Structure formats: structure tokens, C-alpha cells
Amino acid sequence: MLGIETTCDETAAAVVSRDSDGKGHILSNVVRSQTDEHAIYGGVVPEIAARAHVEMLDHLIDAAMREAGIDYAALSGVAAAAGPGLIGGVIVGLTTAKAIALVHDTPLIAVNHLEAHALTPRLTDAIDFPYCLFLASGGHTQIVAVAGVGDYVRLGTTVDDAMGEAFDKVAKMLGLPYPGGPQVEQAARNGDATRFAFPRPMQGRSDANFSLSGLKTAVRNEIGRLESVSEQDVADLCASFQAAVLESTADRLRVGLDLFEQRFGAPTALVAAGGVAANQAIRGALDDVAQAAGTRLIVPPPALCTDNGAMIAWAGAERLALGLVDGMDAPPRARWLLDANAQVPGKFANTRAGF
């Protein structure tokens, strides 16, 4: 299965295989990050991202096929992320996949980008359903019950900012380079996490939703109170912000796991995916939550937590095994709910949160 990923600022192509027993193998996984193109703007510029996908995608697909050592006739299908994401990039990837499928008379699978994240641990760790997914990235923050391929129940979501977006915005306030998440984590190692008393959003609530906009505002207010911001101030602000995120996340996940068990029984694992899962402090907090809940934590390797083609190819292979294929009229989608019956929590609606 060839997989194509172009939903944000990574251009990626990969080839994976799936055995009859469900075991997966990555034959190639080629990713070209656009970080340098967007760094000078302090964030992703959709038009620049789409143009970069156009320039790079054909070359990356060729490289992935060569590395896998197969030709197009050997493909069982072509999978592309059809959303949710920046619509220009989604169109580039999906249109390319349609062309390949049409020319080589092979099935097309239009993959939900979030489903690809959700199914990645079945590629890396061959885990059984049902499991609890914590997906945290620059565009999404969700707790999802993964009951089967195509069977997802969202237990909690952010009502405003995504977690990765909050890290990036705090980094920008403090003058740290883009992408900001790793910069905040690094600065926090040298900081005093108790210096600034930031709020712990949503803590103690009976639902499993997240909120990060108020915490982000609290950081901005503290910066404004400082006459000048020293290197130590930056470290202390980052450490205090990250500590608040950790405590809030742990609380939300404890509630999410309780909701999971009420509906599905004990999960086979707590799984973390998305770029935020690369943060070692957050991994530590997740591990503590998993142990307290009597389950294990599974985090795919960093290269498979962030956006990549292998996860798209694997989701395509899982869907193809169930006979789920798409026609040439499969639409690109800027918004695409993972769980078809999901309701926006309360009055909130935020495209970046995945609604």
C-alpha cells in the first residue's frame, strides 16, 4: 500500500505491507518537513505549504517506491489523507493519489488523517482493540476510544486551542524559534515550575474535555508584568506553563479512561500520538496515568507520532482488508470528524480542534 500525507507542513510518502494475520511492515517512509519555509513567519502559511507539496510530492513518491523496491503494478492500493487539514495541501495529495490509482487501475482509499494516527499503534505494536487514544498535535487534542477500524468514539476534546498550538503560541510570546513545542520543553528543563501559579484548566470536571486558551492568556499576562524578560524568566515561564499542561492533561486523561471503562471495559492500552507525544515530560505524565489505571502506555517512535506517509498507508491497508475503498469522487475535506456521531461540546466549535 502506497500512502500519501499532505495535510499540513510535512510532505510524505511511504509503502507498507500487511500480512494476512494483520501484522504490518514499513517498506519505506520518506518525509520532507517544511519547517525552514515557515520558520521566518512563526507558523505554517497555507499557500506556501500547498506550493511546497506540489514541488516535492512526485519526487517523494518516486523515492518511497524505489526504497521499497517495488513497482506500481505490485501495489494493492493507493491511500491518501483526504482531510482534515489545510485544504490546499489535501487537494494536492488526494489528486495525486487519484491519478496513480486511475493510471495503474488500483483501489483508492481516502483516509481520515486522524484515523491514521489512531491506527498507528497497530502497525508498530500490533495491539488489539479496544484501546484509548490521546491525540495531541498542533491541530488536534482529543481522547478517543478506538473500538475497531472505522469505529471511534470521542470521549474528550479541546473546546478552544489544540495543545501543540498552545505550546507554539507560548514560544512565540517568549521569542523562541518555530516550531515552538520543542523549544518550550528544552527551556523548561532549566526553569522553576513553581515560580508562576498558572491555572489548571478544566481540572475536576466530570467530562474529559480540554481548554488551553485561558492558560495561554495567563502566560501572556505574566510576561506583561515583567519589566524585562531574562533568559531565566523564559525558563521559569516555560516550566510553569508546562507543569500546568501536565497536571491538566493527567486529570483529563484519568476522567477519559474512566469514561472509556464505563462504555468499553478495560482498554488494551493507553496510546499517545501526534507531535506533542514527543515531549518527554508529557510522556512521563501519561505513563503515570496509565500505571495508575492498570494499563500500559504505548507511544509510537517519534517519526511515526508526527505526520508521515506510513500511517496513511497503514490506515489504507487496514481499510482495504475490510473491503473499504473509495471512488474517484472522494472529496478533499478541511473538516472531517473522526467519529461520525460526534457532537461539538457545548457551544464550542473550532476547526483547529478537529470539529
UniProtKB/Swiss-Prot annotation:
<keyword id="KW-0479">Metal-binding</keyword>
<dbReference type="GO" id="GO:0002949">
    <property type="term" value="P:tRNA threonylcarbamoyladenosine modification"/>
</dbReference>
<feature type="binding site">
    <location>
        <position position="279"/>
    </location>
    <ligand>
        <name>substrate</name>
    </ligand>
</feature>
<dbReference type="InterPro" id="IPR017860">
    <property type="entry name" value="Peptidase_M22_CS"/>
</dbReference>
<feature type="binding site">
    <location>
        <begin position="135"/>
        <end position="139"/>
    </location>
    <ligand>
        <name>substrate</name>
    </ligand>
</feature>
<dbReference type="InterPro" id="IPR022450">
    <property type="entry name" value="TsaD"/>
</dbReference>
<dbReference type="GO" id="GO:0005506">
    <property type="term" value="F:iron ion binding"/>
</dbReference>
<feature type="binding site">
    <location>
        <position position="117"/>
    </location>
    <ligand>
        <name>Fe cation</name>
    </ligand>
</feature>
<keyword id="KW-0963">Cytoplasm</keyword>
<dbReference type="GO" id="GO:0061711">
    <property type="term" value="F:N(6)-L-threonylcarbamoyladenine synthase activity"/>
</dbReference>
<dbReference type="InterPro" id="IPR000905">
    <property type="entry name" value="Gcp-like_dom"/>
</dbReference>
<protein>
    <recommendedName>
        <fullName>tRNA N6-adenosine threonylcarbamoyltransferase</fullName>
        <ecNumber>2.3.1.234</ecNumber>
    </recommendedName>
</protein>
<dbReference type="InterPro" id="IPR017861">
    <property type="entry name" value="KAE1/TsaD"/>
</dbReference>
<comment type="function">
    <text>Required for the formation of a threonylcarbamoyl group on adenosine at position 37 (t(6)A37) in tRNAs that read codons beginning with adenine. Is involved in the transfer of the threonylcarbamoyl moiety of threonylcarbamoyl-AMP (TC-AMP) to the N6 group of A37, together with TsaE and TsaB. TsaD likely plays a direct catalytic role in this reaction.</text>
</comment>
<feature type="binding site">
    <location>
        <position position="307"/>
    </location>
    <ligand>
        <name>Fe cation</name>
    </ligand>
</feature>
<keyword id="KW-0808">Transferase</keyword>
<feature type="binding site">
    <location>
        <position position="181"/>
    </location>
    <ligand>
        <name>substrate</name>
    </ligand>
</feature>
<keyword id="KW-0408">Iron</keyword>
<keyword id="KW-0012">Acyltransferase</keyword>
<dbReference type="Pfam" id="PF00814">
    <property type="entry name" value="TsaD"/>
</dbReference>
<comment type="similarity">
    <text>Belongs to the KAE1 / TsaD family.</text>
</comment>
<keyword id="KW-0819">tRNA processing</keyword>
<dbReference type="GO" id="GO:0005737">
    <property type="term" value="C:cytoplasm"/>
</dbReference>
<feature type="binding site">
    <location>
        <position position="113"/>
    </location>
    <ligand>
        <name>Fe cation</name>
    </ligand>
</feature>
<dbReference type="InterPro" id="IPR043129">
    <property type="entry name" value="ATPase_NBD"/>
</dbReference>
<feature type="binding site">
    <location>
        <position position="168"/>
    </location>
    <ligand>
        <name>substrate</name>
    </ligand>
</feature>
